[in-house]
Amino acid sequence: VVSVAEEFFFFEATDNMRVYVDDGRPFIKRAGIRDQIYDYIVLDAFSGDYIPEHMLTREFLDEVRAIMNEDSVLVANTFSTSRLYDHESVTYQRAFGEFFNFKLPSTGNRIIVAQLEPLPPRAELVNRAQQFSDSLSKYGIPILEYPSRLSTRVDWDMSRRQLTDQYSPGNLLREK
Protein backbone atom coordinates (compact mmCIF):
# COMPACT_ATOMS: atom_id res chain seq x y z
CA VAL A 1 0.00 0.00 0.00
CA VAL A 2 2.76 2.44 0.89
CA SER A 3 4.69 1.84 -2.34
CA VAL A 4 1.50 2.39 -4.37
CA ALA A 5 0.82 5.62 -2.47
CA GLU A 6 4.39 6.78 -3.12
CA GLU A 7 4.37 5.88 -6.80
CA PHE A 8 0.89 6.98 -7.83
CA PHE A 9 -0.19 9.55 -5.23
CA PHE A 10 3.14 11.26 -4.50
CA PHE A 11 3.02 10.23 -0.85
CA GLU A 12 6.12 11.01 1.19
CA ALA A 13 6.54 10.17 4.85
CA THR A 14 7.80 13.08 6.94
CA ASP A 15 9.34 13.47 10.37
CA ASN A 16 5.87 14.38 11.67
CA MET A 17 4.28 11.05 10.74
CA ARG A 18 4.81 7.38 11.19
CA VAL A 19 3.47 4.86 8.72
CA TYR A 20 2.95 1.26 9.77
CA VAL A 21 2.14 -1.70 7.58
CA ASP A 22 1.02 -4.55 9.80
CA ASP A 23 -1.92 -6.81 10.58
CA GLY A 24 -4.44 -4.32 11.91
CA ARG A 25 -5.97 -5.97 14.94
CA PRO A 26 -2.76 -7.15 16.64
CA PHE A 27 -1.19 -3.75 15.90
CA ILE A 28 -4.14 -1.92 17.46
CA LYS A 29 -4.13 -4.23 20.48
CA ARG A 30 -0.37 -3.72 21.05
CA ALA A 31 -0.80 0.05 20.72
CA GLY A 32 -3.53 -0.02 23.35
CA ILE A 33 -1.38 -2.05 25.74
CA ARG A 34 1.39 0.55 25.31
CA ASP A 35 -1.11 3.41 25.85
CA GLN A 36 -0.24 4.86 22.45
CA ILE A 37 -2.59 7.44 20.96
CA TYR A 38 -3.00 8.10 17.24
CA ASP A 39 -4.41 11.18 15.54
CA TYR A 40 -5.45 9.50 12.32
CA ILE A 41 -6.31 5.84 11.83
CA VAL A 42 -6.98 4.45 8.35
CA LEU A 43 -8.71 1.09 8.12
CA ASP A 44 -8.44 -0.25 4.58
CA ALA A 45 -8.14 -4.00 5.01
CA PHE A 46 -11.01 -5.24 2.88
CA SER A 47 -10.93 -6.58 -0.65
CA GLY A 48 -13.73 -7.61 -2.96
CA ASP A 49 -12.97 -11.25 -2.20
CA TYR A 50 -12.30 -11.30 1.53
CA ILE A 51 -13.11 -9.39 4.70
CA PRO A 52 -10.99 -9.92 7.83
CA GLU A 53 -13.99 -10.45 10.10
CA HIS A 54 -11.99 -9.78 13.26
CA MET A 55 -11.67 -6.16 12.10
CA LEU A 56 -15.43 -5.61 11.80
CA THR A 57 -16.45 -6.30 15.37
CA ARG A 58 -17.52 -4.11 18.26
CA GLU A 59 -14.59 -5.41 20.29
CA PHE A 60 -12.16 -4.31 17.58
CA LEU A 61 -13.77 -0.88 17.34
CA ASP A 62 -13.51 -0.55 21.13
CA GLU A 63 -9.79 -1.33 20.81
CA VAL A 64 -9.53 1.40 18.15
CA ARG A 65 -11.37 3.85 20.42
CA ALA A 66 -8.82 3.11 23.15
CA ILE A 67 -5.98 4.48 21.00
CA MET A 68 -7.86 7.63 20.00
CA ASN A 69 -8.17 10.97 21.75
CA GLU A 70 -10.89 13.59 21.36
CA ASP A 71 -9.26 14.97 18.19
CA SER A 72 -8.48 11.63 16.53
CA VAL A 73 -10.25 10.49 13.38
CA LEU A 74 -10.94 6.96 12.15
CA VAL A 75 -11.40 6.57 8.40
CA ALA A 76 -12.57 3.14 7.22
CA ASN A 77 -12.87 2.14 3.56
CA THR A 78 -15.62 -0.44 3.35
CA PHE A 79 -18.66 -1.52 1.28
CA SER A 80 -22.13 -0.13 0.65
CA THR A 81 -23.71 -2.88 -1.47
CA SER A 82 -24.09 -6.02 0.59
CA ARG A 83 -26.12 -7.49 3.43
CA LEU A 84 -23.15 -6.65 5.64
CA TYR A 85 -23.96 -2.92 5.33
CA ASP A 86 -26.70 -2.89 7.98
CA HIS A 87 -24.75 -4.96 10.51
CA GLU A 88 -21.56 -2.98 10.02
CA SER A 89 -23.40 0.34 10.28
CA VAL A 90 -25.13 -0.70 13.51
CA THR A 91 -21.75 -1.78 14.91
CA TYR A 92 -20.08 1.54 14.06
CA GLN A 93 -23.02 3.51 15.43
CA ARG A 94 -22.95 1.64 18.73
CA ALA A 95 -19.19 2.12 19.01
CA PHE A 96 -18.99 5.78 17.95
CA GLY A 97 -22.48 7.23 17.89
CA GLU A 98 -23.11 9.41 14.86
CA PHE A 99 -20.57 9.01 12.04
CA PHE A 100 -20.16 10.27 8.49
CA ASN A 101 -20.97 8.01 5.55
CA PHE A 102 -19.27 8.99 2.30
CA LYS A 103 -20.55 7.17 -0.76
CA LEU A 104 -19.98 7.80 -4.45
CA PRO A 105 -22.82 6.51 -6.62
CA SER A 106 -20.46 5.00 -9.20
CA THR A 107 -18.82 2.59 -6.73
CA GLY A 108 -19.89 -0.02 -4.21
CA ASN A 109 -17.56 1.46 -1.62
CA ARG A 110 -18.19 3.79 1.24
CA ILE A 111 -15.90 5.59 3.60
CA ILE A 112 -16.86 5.81 7.25
CA VAL A 113 -15.47 8.78 9.17
CA ALA A 114 -15.81 8.50 12.94
CA GLN A 115 -14.41 10.21 15.99
CA LEU A 116 -14.99 10.30 19.72
CA GLU A 117 -16.14 13.92 19.82
CA PRO A 118 -19.27 15.15 18.02
CA LEU A 119 -18.74 15.50 14.27
CA PRO A 120 -17.80 18.95 12.96
CA PRO A 121 -20.54 21.07 11.38
CA ARG A 122 -20.80 21.10 7.59
CA ALA A 123 -19.64 24.76 7.39
CA GLU A 124 -16.36 23.77 9.03
CA LEU A 125 -15.91 20.94 6.54
CA VAL A 126 -16.52 23.31 3.64
CA ASN A 127 -13.93 25.74 5.03
CA ARG A 128 -11.37 22.95 5.39
CA ALA A 129 -12.09 21.72 1.86
CA GLN A 130 -11.53 25.24 0.52
CA GLN A 131 -8.12 25.33 2.24
CA PHE A 132 -7.00 22.25 0.31
CA SER A 133 -8.83 22.85 -2.95
CA ASP A 134 -5.98 24.45 -4.90
CA SER A 135 -3.37 21.89 -3.89
CA LEU A 136 -5.64 18.90 -4.60
CA SER A 137 -7.23 20.13 -7.83
CA LYS A 138 -4.00 19.47 -9.76
CA TYR A 139 -4.51 15.78 -8.92
CA GLY A 140 -8.11 15.82 -10.12
CA ILE A 141 -9.55 15.55 -6.61
CA PRO A 142 -12.84 17.51 -6.43
CA ILE A 143 -12.60 18.10 -2.69
CA LEU A 144 -15.16 20.91 -2.72
CA GLU A 145 -17.81 18.32 -3.68
CA TYR A 146 -17.04 16.06 -0.74
CA PRO A 147 -18.60 17.90 2.23
CA SER A 148 -22.05 17.66 0.63
CA ARG A 149 -21.57 13.90 0.19
CA LEU A 150 -20.87 13.30 3.88
CA SER A 151 -24.08 12.03 5.41
CA THR A 152 -25.13 11.16 8.94
CA ARG A 153 -28.54 9.92 7.80
CA VAL A 154 -29.38 6.46 9.11
CA ASP A 155 -30.00 4.48 5.91
CA TRP A 156 -29.60 1.05 7.46
CA ASP A 157 -31.86 -1.32 9.36
CA MET A 158 -31.32 -0.49 13.04
CA SER A 159 -32.79 -3.84 14.09
CA ARG A 160 -29.81 -5.71 12.65
CA ARG A 161 -27.44 -7.37 15.05
CA GLN A 162 -24.11 -5.70 15.72
CA LEU A 163 -21.00 -7.64 14.76
CA THR A 164 -19.01 -9.08 17.67
CA ASP A 165 -16.17 -11.51 18.13
CA GLN A 166 -18.86 -14.15 18.76
CA TYR A 167 -21.09 -13.04 15.85
CA SER A 168 -19.19 -11.92 12.77
CA PRO A 169 -20.40 -13.63 9.60
CA GLY A 170 -18.90 -10.87 7.46
CA ASN A 171 -17.88 -13.00 4.51
CA LEU A 172 -21.30 -14.65 4.34
CA LEU A 173 -23.06 -11.30 4.54
CA ARG A 174 -20.74 -9.82 1.91
CA GLU A 175 -22.53 -11.89 -0.71
CA LYS A 176 -25.19 -9.82 -2.46
Which role does the model predict for each range below?
Residues 17-21, 80, 108, 130:
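Sparse recognition of residues in long alpha-helices and their boundaries
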Residues 58-123:
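C-terminal substrate-binding/active-site "lid" region of AdoMet-derived donor-dependent transferases
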Residues 14-16, 71, 96-98, 138-140:
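A generic structural signal for alpha->beta connector loops
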